[in-house]
C-alpha cells in the first residue's frame, strides 16, 4: 500500500491566503483562510513555515502567475516567489497552476468563472456550502471566503492534471 503525499496548497490574496492541506482530494486534513497581518513578506513566510512544521508536506502547490492573462499584484507575485524560495530550500517539489489552467480544468464541469467553480466545488464538498459567497457584482469587493475556493480549485487542478 502506497502512502499518499501530504500536499499543501496556498493561494495568497488580499486577506492573507486560502489554504488546503490534504493527502488526496478526498482526504482533507485542514483548510481555510489564514489571515495575515500585516500583509508583509515575512508574515506570509512565517505562516508557510508554521504549516510546513505542523503538517510536513511533501508537495507545495502555488498559483502560477507568468501567463499574460493573469492579473496579479506585485505583492502577491513577490509572496509566491518567497514561498517558492522557502520550498526550494527545503527540497520540496513545487507545482504551479495559472488561473487559465484552473479555468480549463473546471470548464469541463460546467463553468470557468470563479462563481461557477465555487458552485462546482460545493457540490463535491457540501461542508463548504456555508462559506459559499453570493455571485459578485462588479461594484463589490471579492468575498472573504473566496480564498478557500481558490485554494480548493488550485488543489483539484493539480490532482486532475497530475493523475
Where in this protein do the model-derived segments appear?
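Phosphate- and other anionic-substrate recognition elements at nucleic-acid/protein interfaces
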Residues: 1-163
